């Protein structure tokens, strides 16, 4: 399956012109998805990112940490790709992929050579639209996330940021830790993660 095709863009304008041949443009796909592009004529590599306006603030009280789980689990397989297939697609071409969770957004991104952009678009789109959210992988990632939280708890800067948000925004979803807490991560179920995935509209 290939998603590489010409898609008509409704051109919306130039956002920034750096004067060095690098111009940021904003376009809109027919379904309403906003596309920002920046051409860098001297570069052969391409970075693509899907910024989703769903973050930890959107979690239900009983599903704190679901965004962080989702960030991990989207890389773990679709009906047409295993986790190994997803990783190998980028490794094979010397590319890389990753994701990051924030309070109000999540980003899934990849960097490849320009000739491999269609592959990167296809794989990232498959991950975002067809993830299996495998129960066994969820349990594996639960351990990984608990280790990440333990490492964060050993970093004074991370602890200070989390405590400041907690005190300043007491009771508000923005005051909660982005990654959840050990207690909430232990309690997150597959249903919480699938419910959170349903908030993402591609």
What are these regions (language model features)?
Residues 1-9, 22-23, 28, 39, ...:
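Charge-rich, well-structured scaffold segments of protease-associated domains
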